[in-house]
Amino acid sequence: HGRPALRDIVWDGERIRFLDWENRTYFHDLRQRQAMDVILLLQGMYRESWMKETFVEAAWQGYLEAGGLPVLEEAGRFLEKHGVVREFCSAVHLFHFKDVEAVEKVCRWFAGKKEAFRREKKDLEK
């Protein structure tokens, strides 16, 4: 999809659908595109004032139940590889830009999930 901002996600009472307004793809590998979708979904959630950590945990569980552990792992690897993003967000945090603070929270969330990734992977291997 490419950018699952909350304003581009609709629910008709039965299914979730994505409104896709984009015409350009930045990642050609499907797993990387899915990983970016996860990152952007969480960033969109964290930028909202109504957001609760339980919502992010529900998204995590939803991805796991749908077999999305590899996508979550890829998202974590992407953020780790591009650690300069987190460093930049931390440096400009004092200005309280909504999107910057949200990205910083996403980076922290993924960093805190490393052990959970290992546990989930072990459970799948059983």
Positions of predicted regions on the chain:
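Active-site acidic catalytic loop and adjacent metal/ATP-binding pocket
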Residues: 1-28
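C-lobe/activation-segment region of protein kinase-like
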Residues: 22-117
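An alpha-helical support segment within catalytic cores of ATP-dependent transferases
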Residues: 1, 120-123
